[in-house]
Regions:
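A structural signal for short hydrophobic beta-strand segments in well-ordered beta-sheet cores
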Residues: 57, 67, 100-102, 265-268
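Midchain, well-structured core segments that form catalytic/ion-binding scaffolds
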Residues: 158-289
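Active-site metal-coordination/substrate-binding segment of hydrolases
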Residues: 75-142
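Short helix-capping segments at alpha-helix termini
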Residues: 52, 132-136, 164-165
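Short glycine/serine- and small hydrophobic-enriched flexible loop segments
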Residues: 27, 124-131, 217-223
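N-terminal helical capping/dimerization or prosegment-like subdomains
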Residues: 2-88, 280-287
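Acidic, glycine-rich active-site loops and adjacent beta-strand->loop/helix elements
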Residues: 82-84, 140, 144-152, 176-179, ...
Length: 289
């Protein structure tokens, strides 16, 4: 029998832990935790779980920290990645990114939203579920702080599934959603595009082969993909094709549920300038979309 939820009691319990969750989040923020450098924040999370009385806490071979509440054989997992991107130019920050500066409304710092805030919520949610008898019979709650998401998205759970042998019945991701509940995730693909040219003197561009211009055309085409249709005149229908029963008869309803995909250019690199004071090896701009 499903236990009827007392939402007022749940809200009251969450409010009673507000100060501790705030302290915990600020503690996590204080530990720089870029991908492959999560050791300090893993230790911080492990200590917090142990202090809250988790039934089991462990760190696997990849570095993921896992805490378990309950004694069932089936698992409901709550995931937060605990690595962050770098801080970039610190001069662009209004406050120390590792201080966890706090106002009445926000906690400010690297990882506060993406995604250590989710880790703080999940860690205390599992405690509340156990204290309030909300863990379903036959289940246990697994709270996971996963590593290397920013650089190797998906590898953390591949390790948990294949190496740790953990196969949850259900997974909740605590990625930020502006407070909404999202019921699906489309996933992503990264594509690298290389173009080549020939450098030349800046006063004689006609003597070279400008790779920047080539890449500019590609970037414009990638941007246009976000507005493409799926009629016969459209050469590339990928972003909307999956939504059309004509092209995706078995799964178009699921695709429509998740919505249209997006496409963007994220990074550009080059090996040498397109125009230089003297000839140099051919430039090779690359872009990741």
């Amino acid at each position: 029998m499903t236990k009827e939820l007392d939402f007022d009691a749940i809200k009251a319990a969450a409010e009673s832990h507000r100060a501790d969750m705030t302290r915990f989040l600020r503690a996590m923020i204080s530990h720089p935790s870029e991908s492959c450098e999560e050791g300090e924040v893993v230790a911080c999370i492990k200590a917090e779980m142990e202090s809250l009385g988790y039934d089991e806490v462990r760190v696997d071979g990849l570095g993921n920290v896992m805490g378990f509440m309950g004694e069932g054989d089936k698992i409901i997992a709550i995931d937060s990645h605990i690595d962050t991107v770098g801080i970039g130019n610190i001069e662009n920050w209004d406050a120390d990114p590792y201080e966890g500066y706090e106002t009445d409304e926000i906690i400010y710092g690297r990882g506060g939203s993406d995604q250590e805030g989710g880790m703080a919520s999940a860690t205390y949610a599992a405690k509340m579920m156990k204290d309030m008898g909300l863990i379903p019979e036959g289940y246990k709650i697994m709270v996971v702080g996963t590593v290397q998401e920013e650089d190797c998205d998906g590898m953390c759970w591949q390790y948990i599934y294949n190496k740790d042998g953990i196969k949850p019945e259900f997974v909740i991701s605590t990625e930020p959603t502006d407070g909404g509940i999202y019921r699906g995730h489309r996933g992503r693909m990264e594509i690298r595009v290389d173009v080549h040219g020939t450098s030349c003197h800046g006063s004689a561009p006609d003597r070279g082969d400008n790779a920047i211009y080539k890449m500019a055309d590609i970037i414009a085409d990638v941007r246009a993909l976000n507005n493409n249709g799926c009629d016969e005149s459209t050469d590339i229908k990928g972003l909307v094709k999956m939504l059309d029963p004509k092209y995706n008869p078995e799964h178009y309803e699921d695709a429509r549920f998740l919505g249209r995909g997006t496409c963007t250019v994220s990074q550009i690199f080059y090996t040498s300038p397109a125009a230089a004071p003297w000839p140099t090896p051919a430039p090779s701009p690359s872009t990741v979309v």
